[in-house]
């Protein structure tokens, strides 16, 4: 007589076999009704014999508990992104770099696959059993989505076959079929009056849903595109293609559109073939991925901190749609730059609704020869940024009105001035223009300037509209009674903002210069100016020749700085901020050190992580004052990497390049500043 244990084991094996054929081989060998019947039998038997339920049972993909939150999980090796190209020349340059890096003329073979538009995840198997899954996250640390990934039918909970490594990492994409996406949106909109913008967003939201049962309902699909065995298997695999086929034999889904190419013609033909099939597929792709097939060569070629050097994504040209231009509005930026924005009938491109696109400047309007109600072609550059490509002039009405760039500011009616060199048109009325005033004030109190907690754009806009503030000085005379009359600002929040305004008075010369919002003067340039002049009065009284002497500050920015401090109203405002509002530039301690060469003088430095003794902005200011050059990217020219807690990929890149690494304790000692 067959025991209950034997019945359960037999049912599991049958169901796992059917799942393998259906999800991996795309073959349905039994009807849905038959499958459901067997599944129900197993479920009821396990319900009565819970001690007999293993983690790889088909029933464990339903009925999981609801997660409260996703914990962070570190990847065994970084999950890198891919370099992109949109044309043949980009691919040829990629191949040329590879040839150069391997120093030989041996024929190369490439493994070409579909670039699925999904969510990248990592899955770990131990002894062939699914143990964990994580999203890419920042490449080094992702979200632990183990419970939700278990709900995806195409992810096997137990591998089958031989030569399965003790530990195996599978990487691939989770995506949603277009047909399922349409059904989900109909249901979602009906119940919640909301919808997902595209299948990828739907897949990402479903994968991270707090309830794994919802993930199960969404019918997500997984496809493997790579793996890591950690240790050598009994049968050594030498190519990427062999690894994928091995994964397939273990029951891991791999997309069937894979080819090995040995010539440029073969790769381009595959690209064209997939481009033609793209719209007929039931899932989104945005190109093909070209990988060096040899694992030995992959290792030799290596990776950057962002992407493997041995692979590239050959993306499809941006999709285009035809629509009608309704209007062009001219927006006024913080520095007075006038930017035309085209508004048109909404169109869907790559699953996203688009109704406007920046026209950048006057030259673009003239190039397009835009008229109202023109028929226009819209695309998404890189499948991301909306762009107006061209006008179909043959469809233009005879009486169509041409769009003319204004001669006066659309907000304050001041005459606009054109800078031929910068190809920009500006309103020079500064803070007397409401549009510039609002954005300039928000910039003045933003994080890298004189940061005030809780003082966001909405509050600033309302303060300006009510006439409570006209310039930065007015903020230092605000009282909590002024703030309470604003929307969504109570007594507690108003006191918090007032206290933060008082605290922001103590700042650095660099932050103060940056806060002024001089055109072209960003955080780095502000630091260089502060480091050069040391004192605010020296900067205010400088001439063009002095400004041109500052390394990294070009003629255009020098002129902008000179013009700013040559304007009487600007000088008066700066003086009032210091003398009346009481802004204190706390750089004295740094100035003493600045006069002599230090350990960091003229050294290229990169920062990573969180520091105990300083904020990132404070540390940058100190290092700049010591003559250092701050960079965001690690290279062979970098002299030092300074790291704090929770450091990122730059740390590992620095190790690879033998860059000197300095920790927080060493840093405090070297800069000779008390904590």
Swiss-Prot record:
> Quick one: which residues bind Zn(2+)?
409, 412, 427, 433
Q: Which PROSITE patterns match?
A: BRCT, DNA_LIGASE_N1, DNA_LIGASE_N2
GO CC, sorted alphabetically, is: cytosol
The catalysed reaction is:
NAD(+) + (deoxyribonucleotide)n-3'-hydroxyl + 5'-phospho-(deoxyribonucleotide)m = (deoxyribonucleotide)n+m + AMP + beta-nicotinamide D-nucleotide
Q: Single GO molecular-function term?
A: DNA binding
Q: Does the keyword Disulfide bond apply?
A: no
Q: What class of enzyme is it?
A: ligase
Q: Which cofactor does it need?
A: Mg(2+); Mn(2+)
Residues forming the BRCT domain are 595-675
Q: Which UniProt keywords apply?
A: DNA damage, DNA repair, DNA replication, Ligase, Magnesium, Manganese, Metal-binding, NAD, Zinc
The UniProt entry annotates the active site at 115 (n6-amp-lysine intermediate)
Q: Which SMART domains match?
A: BRCT (SM00292), HhH1 (SM00278), LIGANc (SM00532)
Enzyme Commission number(s) of this protein: 6.5.1.2
| Sites where the protein binds NAD(+) | 32-36, 81-82, 113, 136, 173, 291, 315
Tell me yes or no: is Repeat among this UniProt entry's keywords.
no
HAMAP family cross-referenced by the UniProt entry: DNA_ligase_A
Q: Which family does it belong to?
A: Belongs to the NAD-dependent DNA ligase family. LigA subfamily.
Q: What is this protein called?
A: DNA ligase
Upper taxonomic lineage: Bacteria, Pseudomonadati, Pseudomonadota, Gammaproteobacteria, Enterobacterales
């Amino acid at each position: 007589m067959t025991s209950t244990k034997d019945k359960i084991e037999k049912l599991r094996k049958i169901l796992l076999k059917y799942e393998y054929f259906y999800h991996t081989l795309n073959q349905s060998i039994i009807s849905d009704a038959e499958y459901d019947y067997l599944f129900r039998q197993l479920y009821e038997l396990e319900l009565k014999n819970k001690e007999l339920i293993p983690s790889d049972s088909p029933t464990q993909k339903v009925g999981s508990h609801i997660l409260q939150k996703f914990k962070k999980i570190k990847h065994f090796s970084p999950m890198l992104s891919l370099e992109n190209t949109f044309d043949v020349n980009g691919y040829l340059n990629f191949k040329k770099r590879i040839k150069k890096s391997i120093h030989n003329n041996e024929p190369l073979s490439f493994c070409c696959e579909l670039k699925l538009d999904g969510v990248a995840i990592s899955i770990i198997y131990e002894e062939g059993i699914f143990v964990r899954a994580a999203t890419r996250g920042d490449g080094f640390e992702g979200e632990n989505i183990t419970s939700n990934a278990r709900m995806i039918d195409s992810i096997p909970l137990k591998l089958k076959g031989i030569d399965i490594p003790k530990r195996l990492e599978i990487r691939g994409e989770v995506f949603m079929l277009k047909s399922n996406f349409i059904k989900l949106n109909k249901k979602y909109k009906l119940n919640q009056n909301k919808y997902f913008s595209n299948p990828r967003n739907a897949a990402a939201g479903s994968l991270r849903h707090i309830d794994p049962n919802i993930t199960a309902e969404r019918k997500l699909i997984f496809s493997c595109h790579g793996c890591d065995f950690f240790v050598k298997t009994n049968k050594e695999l030498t190519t990427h293609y062999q690894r994928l086929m091995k994964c397939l034999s273990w029951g891991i889904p791999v997309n069937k559109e894979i080819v090995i190419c040995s010539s440029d013609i073969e790769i381009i033909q595959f690209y064209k073939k997939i481009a033609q099939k793209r719209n007929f597929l039931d899932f989104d792709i945005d190109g093909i991925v070209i990988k060096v097939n040899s694992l030995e060569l992959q290792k030799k070629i290596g990776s950057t901190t962002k992407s493997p050097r041995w692979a590239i994504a050959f993306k499809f040209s941006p999709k285009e749609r035809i629509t009608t231009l309704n209007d062009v509005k001219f927006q006024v930026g913080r520095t007075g730059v006038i930017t035309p924005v085209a508004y048109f009938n909404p169109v869907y491109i790559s699953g996203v609704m688009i109704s406007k696109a920046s026209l950048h400047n006057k030259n673009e309007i003239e190039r397009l020869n835009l008229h109202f109600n023109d028929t226009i072609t819209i695309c998404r550059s890189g499948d991301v940024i909306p762009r107006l490509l061209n006008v179909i002039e043959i469809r233009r009405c005879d009486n169509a009105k041409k769009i003319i760039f204004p001669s006066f500011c659309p907000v304050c009616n001041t005459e606009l001035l054109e800078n031929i060199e910068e190809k920009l048109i500006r309103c020079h009325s500064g803070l007397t223009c409401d549009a510039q005033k609002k954005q300039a004030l928000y910039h003045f109190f933003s994080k890298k300037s004189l940061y005030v907690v809780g003082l966001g754009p909405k509050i600033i806009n309302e303060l300006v509209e009510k006439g409570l503030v006209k310039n930065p000085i007015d903020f230092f005379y605000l009282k909590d009674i002024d703030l309470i009359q604003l929307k969504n600002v109570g007594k507690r929040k108003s006191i918090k903002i007032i206290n933060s305004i008082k605290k922001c008075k103590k700042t650095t010369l660099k932050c103060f210069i940056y806060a002024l919002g001089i055109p072209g003067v960003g955080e780095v340039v502000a630091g260089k100016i502060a480091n050069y002049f040391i004192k605010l009065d020296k900067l205010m009284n400088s001439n063009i020749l002095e400004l041109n002497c500052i390394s990294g500050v070009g003629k255009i920015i020098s002129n902008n700085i000179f013009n700013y401090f040559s304007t009487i109203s600007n000088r008066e405002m700066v003086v009032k901020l210091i003398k009346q509002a009481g802004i204190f530039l706390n750089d004295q301690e740094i100035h003493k050190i600045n006069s002599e060469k230090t350990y960091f003088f003229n050294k290229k430095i990169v920062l990573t992580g969180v520091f105990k003794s300083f904020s990132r902005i404070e540390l940058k200011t100190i290092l700049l004052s010591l003559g250092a050059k701050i960079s965001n990217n690690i290279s062979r020219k970098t002299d030092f990497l300074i790291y704090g807690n929770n450091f990122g990929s730059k740390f590992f890149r620095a190790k690879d390049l033998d860059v000197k690494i300095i920790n927080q304790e060493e840093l405090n000692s070297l800069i000779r500043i008390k904590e």
